[in-house]
Amino acid sequence: MVADNGYEEYFQALSVRSDDVEGQADCLSALVPVMQQAQVDYAEDPSETNELIVELVEEYDTGWVYTAEAAEYAHDQGLEIGIVADGSDGVMGSFDEARVQGLMDIVGEYAGVDTAAFTPEEMATNQFLDDSISLG
């Protein structure tokens, strides 16, 4: 995995333009906890969601092959190897500032992007999280 080599990205993190964070704060305050809980619910019982995904893959017939067995394996592996896990603070979906800084350092070095003008706090926020939602 890429993370095994030091690039511990936040896979599929919700992104919002910084100019929109304040203006969409009410929406984000409602949406983010729903997304947190959905991840926990899926981790605890993926059967209904996996069934729907497999059904839609077949229905849309885009060439992607995804079986019920593959869905179950992906779910189980995600939990087993820590791809799906609470943040270092025990909250589902939280960002760790040191981890964000590490990602910024890698992007700066290898992508030639000047990240020195930004801080982890400017790049990611835990502002809209419900601290009570976790895998426990």
Predicted feature residues:
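Short beta-strand->loop
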Residues: 1-9
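A bilobed periplasmic-binding-protein/Venus flytrap-type ligand-binding module shared by bacterial periplasmic
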Residues: 11-26
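Residue-level signal for pocket-adjacent positions within structured domains
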Residues: 9, 16, 90, 118, ...
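Conserved C-terminal helix/tail region of periplasmic/extracytoplasmic solute-binding proteins
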Residues: 97-136
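Secondary-structure end/capping motifs
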Residues: 23-110
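Alpha-helix initiation/capping motif
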Residues: 1-2, 17, 67-68, 96, ...
